[in-house]
């Protein structure tokens, strides 16, 4: 854990390792509503953003705004905070968030996303050595036109960053309403990272401006160690021995939601963050049982009340396959995740392979993984029997929805089928 770690909502948190060294130059964008650059088309992909560009040059365009989402049906009222009386039909909670607008080619299309934020933010995935440009547009807040909050993009854990691109507004730039800023990155270290807005970060992170980013290792596609012929050549890290090889991957952004703070932001009130008392505990922006609902698309109304919470946390695999679980915590509480009846092997912490100075693997076999605020873990599981297994927070206090009866909160399901039940995975969380 780095010196920026936090256990209370009083500021930013660090991932605690040397990760990506930023270089090159980025450029300020034009006025958003005056002109709009053309970006590459994006195939429909509800989980991980497919960046535009061929080869090692990748471009992504994100927009920051506000919107409405839904907590699990049947959650008891906590008036006046939940459900929010200003929420449109089908929704109950006010949020801030990011949207992927990479495929949009006109200013009008991008502007139409205002007031339609999603949580958690789009997952981003890049390869080692990619030249990455992420353009952030600030669309403003539809519900709060009185606010002129800027937004930034902070790649959590990328140390030694050029301040201009680090996203900490005190040391760099914030994107004002109606403007763009392009961030430039060249990732050199594989691992599981996260990103968030660092402008008024205690508020903006709690309100939903959090997402995950993966850097895939250069070792991918290469047979190393004792990896058998025919096995999928995907790895979590450049391990050199194949010990982090996996068949499927699923990512989880761990957060909490304090209904009172979300209500106050919608109703022009101020929160005292020392009173922090979450009402809901979420995986990828959803509480159980919504966590096991299918992936959605924020552009489609078919998702109903989960339209703007499009990322599923359901884990599926065939018996005997190895599954990579990417865990990131941008909440303000510690979370200890337990997987019933399936051993877990922790191979990395904070985007750093667990390896000793002598080169030996220091992986940890366990049934519970602790993830502190601002931290990440990479975990491998290989189920040996068919069935359904629960992955959940070990603190039962975090397994409810707004204090209501029954199970809820930070819980999902690992569903293991016979060989051949699930075809090859093409995207994370599918």
Residue ranges and their predicted role:
Residues 139-154, 158-162, 166-227, 361-430:
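Extracellular/periplasmic metallocenter environments
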Residues 62-67, 137, 186, 198, ...:
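Structured loops at beta-to-helix junctions and adjacent beta-edge loops in soluble globular domains
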Residues 319-326, 332-336:
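Beta-propeller domains
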Residues 2-6, 11-155, 159-165, 169-174, ...:
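N-terminal, post-signal-peptide metal-ligating segments of extracellular/periplasmic oxidoreductases
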């Amino acid at each position: 854990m780095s010196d920026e770690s936090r256990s209370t909502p009083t500021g930013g948190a660090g991932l605690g390792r040397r990760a990506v060294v930023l270089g090159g130059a980025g450029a300020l964008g034009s006025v958003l509503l005056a002109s709009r650059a053309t970006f590459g088309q994006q195939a429909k992909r509800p989980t991980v953003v497919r960046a535009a560009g061929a080869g090692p040059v990748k471009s992504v365009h994100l927009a920051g705004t506000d919107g409405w989402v839904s907590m699990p049906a049947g959650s008891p009222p906590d008036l006046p905070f939940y459900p929010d009386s200003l929420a449109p039909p089908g929704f109950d909670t006010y949020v801030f968030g990011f949207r992927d607008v990479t495929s949009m080619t006109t200013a009008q299309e991008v502007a139409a996303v205002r007031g339609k934020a999603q949580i958690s933010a789009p997952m981003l995935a890049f390869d080692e050595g990619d030249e990455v440009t992420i353009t952030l547009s600030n669309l403003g807040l539809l519900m709060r036109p009185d606010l002129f909050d800027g937004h930034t993009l902070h790649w959590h854990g990328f140390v030694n960053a050029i301040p201009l691109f680090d996203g900490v507004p005190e040391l760099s730039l914030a994107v004002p309403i109606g403007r763009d800023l392009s961030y430039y990155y060249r990732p050199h270290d594989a691992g599981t990272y996260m990103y968030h807005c660092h402008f008024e970060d205690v508020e903006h992170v709690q309100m939903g401006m959090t997402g995950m980013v993966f850097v895939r290792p250069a070792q991918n596609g290469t047979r190393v160690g004792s990896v058998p012929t025919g096995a999928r050549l995907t790895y979590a890290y450049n391990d050199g021995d194949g010990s982090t090889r996996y068949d499927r991957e699923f990512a989880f952004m761990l957060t909490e939601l304090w209904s009172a703070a979300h209500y106050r932001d919608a109703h022009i009130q101020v929160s005292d963050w020392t009173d922090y008392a979450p009402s809901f505990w979420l995986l990828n922006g959803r509480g159980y049982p919504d966590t096991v609902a299918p992936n959605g698309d924020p552009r489609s109304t078919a998702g109903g009340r989960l339209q703007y919470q499009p990322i599923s946390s359901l884990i599926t695999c065939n018996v005997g396959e190895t599954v990579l679980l990417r865990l990131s915590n941008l909440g303000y509480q510690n979370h200890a995740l337990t997987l019933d009846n399936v051993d877990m092997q922790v191979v990395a912490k904070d985007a750093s392979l667990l390896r000793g100075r002598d080169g030996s693997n220091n992986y940890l076999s366990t049934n519970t993984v602790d993830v502190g605020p601002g931290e990440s873990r990479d975990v491998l599981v290989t189920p040996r029997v068919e069935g359904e297994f629960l992955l959940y927070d070990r603190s039962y206090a975090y397994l409810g929805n707004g204090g209501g009866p029954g199970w809820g909160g930070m819980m999902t399901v690992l569903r293991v089928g016979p060989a051949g039940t699930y075809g090859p995975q093409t995207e994370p969380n599918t």
